[in-house]
Amino acid sequence: MQKFLLLLLTLLCLSCFQTERHCSDFKTGTFQFDYAVDGIEKTGTFVRTETLNIDYYENKVDSASVRWINDCEFIQKKINPKNKSEENAIHFKILSTTKDSYTFEYQLAVKDAFKKKRIEKGTAKKIK
């Protein structure tokens, strides 16, 4: 019985833990992120304003509009998509923050009935 109560108390304490998020600190700025292409690690940079996201990667520049849903979630849509798949908006959600970085997840903003739902995660570091 004591073990059960101890386990119950531990679970109760752990369930009250909430990840601290200061999402508004990461709404705008210059950020750096790592990604892999064919197993090769690369680093990209992006600049985000309240309404625009500009990506710099592999000597390319790409722009997207940004629409904030709340302090921790936004929808991003490419301004000049090059193909049909780039026309799809992406929903980003900041999961946790530290002093200079945040962890996020992203997925297609609109569900495609013919595709399996795919959620990816990443981390971005604020450099400016």
Positions of predicted regions on the chain:
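C-terminal motif of bacterial Sec signal peptides marking the signal peptidase cleavage site
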Residues: 12-15
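Beta-sheet ligand-binding and adhesion/scaffold domains
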Residues: 80-128
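Positively charged n-region of N-terminal signal peptides that target proteins for export
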Residues: 1-4
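Short hydrophobic/aromatic-rich beta-strand segments that constitute the beta-sheet cores
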Residues: 33, 53-56, 74-78, 102-106
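N-terminal glycine/threonine-rich, aromatic-flanked beta-hairpin/loop signature
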Residues: 42-69
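Bacterial signal peptide processing site
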Residues: 17-19
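Surface-exposed, beta-sheet-biased, low-hydrophobicity segments with strongly acidic/polar composition
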Residues: 41, 46-48, 71-73, 83, ...
